[in-house]
Amino acid sequence: MSTPQSKAKPSAAEWTVQDATELYRIGSWGEPFFFVNANGHMAVRALDEAGTTMDVVDIVNELRRRGVQFPVLLRFQDVLRAQVRRVNEAFRTAIADANYGNISRGIYPIKVNQLHEVVDELLDAGRPFGMGLECGS
């Protein structure tokens, strides 16, 4: 019985951005928003015309400098808005491609995250798609 050979782990000096990207499988969960930057830090890409990026380590260091108590929650509204648009457009495309004679309305289960800022952002982003809230149990 043979076992697959695992790739030798690189030393810290040999570690690359690609190594981090593969190890943490960022391509499967983070694209197009999250990536490992040239410094080897987790970074966030805003989907604006300027191509703004934010180094998460820089954000954490700035919060520490300001005396903010940890843990903290970092919320990137561009990500929420873009994902609402992405899901709704995917359903619209599938409905059109299948010549389905009805519509789809996204419903956000409020028990997932009740924070006012999150719910407002999701509802605002979902307004063009008729998105609503599910408040049941």
What kind of region is each of these model predictions?
Residues 2-136:
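A charged N-terminal "starter" segment
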